[in-house]
Amino acid sequence: MDEETPSICEQCLTDADLRMTRAARGAECKICTLPFTLYHFKPPGAPRVTKTLVCRRCAAQRNVCQCCMLDLAWKLPVALRDELVSLVQGSDERTPEASNEMVRRFLALRGGQLGGARLTADSAPLRELMGKMRAVAAAAAPAARAHGGREDAGEVPETQLPFGGALATPASRSFFIYGVDPALPEWELVDAVSQLVRTPDWRDAGSVSVVVRQDARCAGIRFRREELAQAFVARLETLPAAAGAPKGVLRIRHLRMHVVAWPEFHLAAFGETKQQTEGIARLATKTMRADAEGASPARPAAPASAAGKVAKKAAAPRRQGRRGPRPTLEL
């Protein structure tokens, strides 16, 4: 299957006549870890090269793009898509993701489709699913009108987002991340958190555990155990705040984001309209600027040198000035 045309969405490809470079067994799949045929290319005007991250087999199983790993039908992250499908179908449609490498390879080699991809990858089940979603939306519309709804579609739900929160909150397994770069993909955030807590099996399988909203410059993560959340907090840099509530600093490549605890983690807080997400993005940028003006991040102290000595070279003695006159030789 790797020898076939790669499965890449229009947003990543941008041009059907784009020139690609193909490397057989050029990388390991981010999901099954098996070697696969790597494709990389540079879209017109893009600042960097785009490459495939997962193999064709794993992408087909989940009905996702090999580059951005978003659902090909809905352009949503897999976890969010499966959650929506589960709500509409009334059954558990989550994609099984094994933590064991051998099980991941077994799932990849078994073939078939997983989770919500069983419905979104085929046109007939997708039409039926969309019909159910329209029926649910039509039934919910009168109730929304009865409650008055939002008078201002551009209102930003600031009270639902903990921009003024702190990093260390007892018994919190969820965190709010703001200052997210619009070009940061979800998989890269997941990888960065996995490296910090030193395990890829940190997500809560019982709910949506990772949400990245690049348009709102925010994200949310939820750990499955409190011990993992504490390990995450312990390995972050800290940013002291003026009010005495320190925040965390998460660095991915050259990007820097701020982290606070968010016990009330929920999807609706990220906004429902374009005006709301734009307002949240402005608020995130403003808060990042205010945080930077208030304090600079404190990094872990560097290890002391042996015997507590200062690791500085002794200053070399200054050279003397010009030499005096040479002594006269008497013959």
From Swiss-Prot:
Belongs to the SLT11 family. The keyword Nucleus applies. The keyword Nucleus applies. Residues 293-309 have a biased composition (Low complexity). Residues 288-331 are annotated as: Disordered. GO terms for biological process: mRNA splicing, via spliceosome. It comes from Eremothecium gossypii (strain ATCC 10895 / CBS 109.51 / FGSC 9923 / NRRL Y-1056). Associated with the spliceosome. This is Pre-mRNA-splicing factor SLT11.
